[in-house]
C-alpha cells in the first residue's frame, strides 16, 4: 500500500468569513491523495506562536480571499514554509508577485492549465575541494633560473650608437619628406624652456591691446545720482573732541546728550498719552439699533444663549432692535 502524502492548510484571517473556501481546499487535497494533518492561521506562524516541522509536509495550500495580483504575504514565511516541505513538495496559493522570493528559497515555478504551484527542489550542497598550497618544483638547467612566478623583463640602457642606428632606421621607413620626431621634441623643449612672462605677453597681444589708464573705471560712475541724493547715516559732531559719532559720549559735556534725551522724552510722552473717547464717539456704536455698527457677536437682542461673556445685557430677556433698555437696576446689583 502506498504511503499517503501529508498536507497543511494555511488560512488568511479574511478567509474565516467564508468557511467554504477552506473546505474546498481540503477536499481538493484529498482528491489528489493528500491527507491534511493540520490547518493554521497565517498570522500564528508569522508571530512565532506556531512552529512548523522541517521536511514534514508534501503539500501546503494557502487559502486567501485576495485576488492573485493583490496578494499580500510575508516574504520571510516563504523560507519557513520551504523548510517544512519535503523535496519535490508543492506550495499552492501564491502568485508571480513573489516569484523572486520563490527562486531565492530554491523553489521552481510550475505552470499548467489547471494548477499553478511552486515545487521545492533539492538543495545543492557545496563540496569541499582540496587546494595544494605548495608550488610544484620545476627542474632547472645550468644557466637558467626558473621560479613559480614569471621572470621580469630585463631592460638595457641605450648607448649613443644604438640611438644613431634607430634614427637611421626611422628615416629609411618614413622617408625624407617627414620631419623627425626628435626635431619636434627639441622644438617643444625650446618653447617650454622660455620665460613664462613671454607667454603671457603673447597671450595679451593676441587678445587685444593692453589696458591703459583711460580704460580704468571710476568708482563714482558706478553710483547713480538718485543714490547719492539719499540721506546717509546721521552722524553727530562732538563739540568737545570735534569728532563725528553716532551717539553722544558717555561723559558728554557739549550738550549732545541732553538733546538726545529731549528727543527720547518727546517720544515717550506721545506713547504715554491715554486714548479717550468723547460722548459722540461712544454712542457711535449702538448694539440695539438694527443696521448700525455692532460688536463682535451682533446678537445682543436675541437673549443670553447668543450673548458674549462680557455683554452688558446678560441676565435680561430678549428685546427688539431699537427698544430702550434701562440698565439702572444692574447698578443696584453691583
UniProtKB/Swiss-Prot annotation:
Coiled-coil annotated spans: none
Chain location of the short sequence motif Cx2C motif 1 per the record: 297-300
Spans annotated as Fe-S binding site A: 238-254
Gene Ontology BP annotations: iron-sulfur cluster assembly
Recorded GO CC terms: mitochondrial intermembrane space
Predominant cellular place of this UniProt entry's protein: cytoplasm
Acidic residues bias: start-end ranges: 182-192, 215-227
Region called Linker, residue ranges: 132-228
Residues reported to bind [2Fe-2S] cluster: 238, 249, 252, 254
Region: N-terminal SAM-like domain, residue numbers: 1-131
Subcellular location(s) per record: Cytoplasm; Mitochondrion intermembrane space
Motif Cx2C motif 2 location, chain numbering: 308-311
InterPro entries: Anamorsin (IPR007785), CIAPIN1 (IPR046408), Dre2_N (IPR031838)
Residue ranges crossing the lipid bilayer per the database entry: none
Gene3D superfamilies: Fe-S cluster assembly protein Dre2, N-terminal domain
Subunit: Monomer. Interacts with TAH18. Interacts with MIA40.
Family annotation (PANTHER family): ANAMORSIN
Function: Component of the cytosolic iron-sulfur (Fe-S) protein assembly (CIA) machinery required for the maturation of extramitochondrial Fe-S proteins. Part of an electron transfer chain functioning in an early step of cytosolic Fe-S biogenesis, facilitating the de novo assembly of a [4Fe-4S] cluster on the scaffold complex CFD1-NBP35. Electrons are transferred to DRE2 from NADPH via the FAD- and FMN-containing protein TAH18.
Name of the featured protein: Fe-S cluster assembly protein DRE2
